[in-house]
């Protein structure tokens, strides 16, 4: 009854109609190889489809046994096309007596959120301004060209090299925000064009893998700040985060590092090492182990371009040093911006909340300004981005007042901070988590 997930596994009654299920029955199918999801009251067996899912293997599993309607709508800009892929997986629908929402979720809130999405669509918030993204790509290419020309004209002296490194790090950081736009399918009308340009930006301009990014990032969006589902809160035992994990580690006497000092050693092993060490290794390991040869070719094209440009001036050794110094600076930029909206927020195990509530407890916004928009790639509107990941980032500000009003209506906390305050909260939250760990380690 739970296996397969192909068209031949459909379950029908004697009249050839699809079966009806209760939520209790659906919630039994959550294990690997036996996974059902509900979308728009229809029940789908995705047990085998997870292996072919373009969004990654795990993201569907994270919603097994649940209503995935909001996630389904949020991630897919072309719903009609995606529904065609779902048809062979259909095995039934919820019984008429069953609510549309599972696990006692607030039906009125869910319906109001869906109405908000429809209103934003009607107001054109999901429509792209091509010039916006063309200018962003143009300024990245311009920065790359300026860096090369500075070495060409002014040589390899220390001061000039430092300026060149800052320019290259800026280009890399901005390319990181731009690939994020294409990865979320928020630029072109077709997924194919978004995927193609995504591979160009993340592969050729950054030397990373689109497949690796998709696998990690979509899980993060689907279940933000949820242990065992969001890879961004898997700290590899280097840190304990939130209020739950530190106590668990403390009670179990787990001490891989002195976590009560993590707010101090964060400066040495967090921002400096994430991209140049951990991501660098993980990206290549992922591409090779999973046979992502197209991604690997795009990635290699970046390294060929970089070393052709800079070994002629610096030689191989110093070109490698420059490369890693650029990665080192980019890593600081990336970590502070991406973590300011998540690490200080609630981090816990699955609580089966509705889409709006789940995203709002895990994200916060940063005050809008021209600098903050550019510096963070508009991730200062993290709340709106998480609720509507396919909305082009130049329209987040239009959605923000509507989202805030909906949150106020239902008593959902909508947090907005200053940039400096958000940075400081990262350290404060790490310190608090470390103190919770130490107390549990010594006294429980």
From Swiss-Prot:
GO terms classed as biological process: lipid metabolic process; liver development; unsaturated fatty acid biosynthetic process
CDD domains for the chain: Delta6-FADS-like
This protein's pathway: Lipid metabolism; polyunsaturated fatty acid biosynthesis
Compartment list: Endoplasmic reticulum membrane
Reaction(s) catalysed (UniProt annotation): (9Z,12Z)-octadecadienoyl-CoA + 2 Fe(II)-[cytochrome b5] + O2 + 2 H(+) = (6Z,9Z,12Z)-octadecatrienoyl-CoA + 2 Fe(III)-[cytochrome b5] + 2 H2O; (9Z,12Z,15Z)-octadecatrienoyl-CoA + 2 Fe(II)-[cytochrome b5] + O2 + 2 H(+) = (6Z,9Z,12Z,15Z)-octadecatetraenoyl-CoA + 2 Fe(III)-[cytochrome b5] + 2 H2O; (8Z,11Z,14Z,17Z)-eicosatetraenoyl-CoA + 2 Fe(II)-[cytochrome b5] + O2 + 2 H(+) = (5Z,8Z,11Z,14Z,17Z)-eicosapentaenoyl-CoA + 2 Fe(III)-[cytochrome b5] + 2 H2O; (8Z,11Z,14Z)-eicosatrienoyl-CoA + 2 Fe(II)-[cytochrome b5] + O2 + 2 H(+) = (5Z,8Z,11Z,14Z)-eicosatetraenoyl-CoA + 2 Fe(III)-[cytochrome b5] + 2 H2O
Membrane topology: Multi-pass membrane protein
Gene Ontology molecular function terms on file: acyl-CoA (8-3)-desaturase activity; acyl-CoA 6-desaturase activity; oxidoreductase activity, acting on paired donors, with oxidation of a pair of donors resulting in the reduction of molecular oxygen to two molecules of water
Enzyme class: oxidoreductase
Function per UniProt: Fatty acid desaturase with bifunctional delta-5 and delta-6 activities. Component of a lipid metabolic pathway that catalyzes the biosynthesis of polyunsaturated fatty acids (PUFA) with preference toward n-3 substrates and Delta-6 function.
Name of the protein described by the UniProt record: Acyl-CoA 6-desaturase
Gene: fads2
């Amino acid at each position: 009854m739970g296996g397969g997930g192909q068209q031949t596994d459909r379950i029908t009654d004697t009249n050839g109609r699809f079966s009806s299920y209760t939520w209790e029955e659906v919630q039994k199918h959550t294990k690997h190889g036996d996974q059902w999801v509900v979308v728009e009251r229809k029940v789908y067996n995705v047990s085998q489809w997870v292996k072919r899912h373009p969004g990654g293997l795990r993201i569907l599993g994270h919603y097994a046994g649940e209503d995935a309607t909001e996630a389904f709508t949020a991630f897919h800009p072309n719903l009609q096309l995606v529904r065609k892929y779902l048809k062979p997986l259909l095995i039934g629908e919820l019984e008429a007596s069953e609510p549309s929402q599972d696990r006692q979720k607030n039906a009125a809130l869910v319906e109001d959120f869906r109405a908000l999405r429809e209103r934003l669509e009607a107001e054109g918030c999901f429509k792209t301004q091509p010039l916006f993204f063309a200018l962003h790509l143009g300024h990245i290419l311009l920065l790359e060209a300026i860096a090369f020309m500075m070495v060409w004209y002014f040589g390899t002296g220390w001061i000039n090299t430092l300026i060149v490194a800052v320019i290259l790090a800026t280009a890399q950081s901005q390319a990181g925000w731009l690939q994020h736009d294409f990865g979320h399918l928020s630029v072109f009308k077709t997924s194919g064009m978004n995927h193609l340009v995504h591979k160009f930006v993340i592969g050729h301009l950054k030397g990373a893998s689109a497949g690796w990014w998709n696998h990690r990032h979509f899980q993060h969006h689907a279940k933000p700040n949820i242990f065992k589902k969001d890879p961004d809160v898997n700290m590899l035992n280097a840190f304990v985060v939130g209020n739950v994990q530190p106590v668990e580690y403390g009670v179990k006497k787990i001490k891989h590092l002195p976590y009560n000092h993590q707010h101090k050693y964060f400066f040495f092993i967090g921002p400096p090492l994430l991209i140049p060490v951990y991501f660098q290794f993980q990206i290549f390991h992922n591409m090779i182990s999973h046979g992502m040869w197209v991604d690997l070719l795009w990635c290699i094209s970046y390294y060929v371009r970089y070393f052709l440009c800079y070994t002629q001036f610096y030689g191989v050794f110093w070109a490698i040093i420059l490369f890693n110094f650029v990665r080192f600076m980019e890593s600081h930029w990336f970590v502070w911006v991406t973590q300011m909206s998540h690490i200080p927020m609630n981090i816990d195990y699955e609580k089966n909340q509705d889409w709006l509530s789940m995203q709002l407890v895990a994200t916060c916004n940063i005050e809008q300004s021209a600098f903050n928009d550019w510096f963070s790639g508009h991730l200062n509107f993290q709340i709106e981005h998480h609720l509507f990941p396919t909305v082009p980032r130049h329209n987040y500000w239009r959605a923000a007042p509507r989202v805030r009003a909906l949150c106020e209506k239902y008593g959902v906390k909508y947090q907005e901070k200053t940039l400096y305050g958000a940075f400081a909260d990262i350290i404060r939250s790490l310190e608090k988590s470390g103190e919770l760990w130490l107390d549990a380690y010594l006294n429980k």
